[in-house]
Curated annotation (Swiss-Prot):
Described purpose of this protein according to its UniProt entry: Participates in chromosomal partition during cell division. May act via the formation of a condensin-like complex containing Smc and ScpA that pull DNA away from mid-cell into both cell halves.
Record's protein name: Segregation and condensation protein B
UniProt xrefs under NCBIfam families: SMC-Scp complex subunit ScpB
Keywords: Cell cycle, Cell division, Chromosome partition, Cytoplasm
Subunit structure: Homodimer. Homodimerization may be required to stabilize the binding of ScpA to the Smc head domains. Component of a cohesin-like complex composed of ScpA, ScpB and the Smc homodimer, in which ScpA and ScpB bind to the head domain of Smc. The presence of the three proteins is required for the association of the complex with DNA.
Chief location category: cytoplasm
Pfam family, any one: SMC_ScpB
Lineage: superkingdom: Bacteria
Length: 190
């Protein structure tokens, strides 16, 4: 495998690792190269991103590498955040939102155990839409972030309090929480 292909694969690995980032050891294992070689490639890629007219940079914090946006573009990102969007939430985001609404405060890991898949993207979407927020930290190893719904969540779905959420009766416990939640909300909106 040539250097260009290695960089392409590393770029993809950085992307899919998201905010958690990736260790050079992981890259070395995936590419079946020495760790020093992985670090050299990452450093080359950092320089290429800095020198080029690109919107992303590769940053390193505590031995972890990840993509980050450039500070000089921050005003444009803020405009995007401030721009109302008509885009609806994905099914994954809706399922995650229902889990948070009924089980809050809840950690990302607990959500992933319920859904059976990663929730990183859905969480980012829900936080950016101000429907959920960090509510604190759980006790225990790593002190994971606890998530809960926001006032904007209540406003968006026409709820005064969380007590207005459709109840989970025994017959509905087997039903998908997202389907139940949004089915009941459709009844409320009629």
């Amino acid at each position: 495998m040539d250097r260009k292909e290695q960089k392409s694969i590393i770029e993809g690995l950085l992307f899919v690792s998201g905010d958690e980032g990736i260790y050079p050891e992981q890259i070395a294992k995936v590419l079946e190269i020495e760790m020093n070689e992985a670090i050299n490639i990452l450093e080359e890629m950092q320089q290429e991103c800095e020198g080029a007219n690109r919107g992303l940079q590769i940053v390193q914090y505590a031995k972890v590498y990840r993509f980050a946006t450039k500070k000089e573009h921050a005003s444009y990102y803020q405009k995007l955040i401030d721009t109302p969007t008509a885009a609806s939430l994905s099914q994954a985001a809706l399922e995650t939102l229902a889990i948070v609404a009924y089980r809050q405060p809840i950690t990302r890991t607990e959500m992933e155990e319920i859904r059976g898949v990663k929730t990183d993207k859905a969480l980012q979407t829900l936080v950016s839409h101000l429907l959920i927020k960090e509510m604190g930290r759980a006790e225990g190893p790593g002190r994971p972030i606890l998530y809960g719904t926001t006032k904007e969540f209540l406003d968006t779905f026409g709820l005064k309090t969380l007590d207005d959420l459709p109840p989970l009766s025994e017959e509905n416990e087997q039903m998908n929480e997202a389907d139940l939640f949004f089915g009941c909300l459709q009844e409320i909106w009629k």
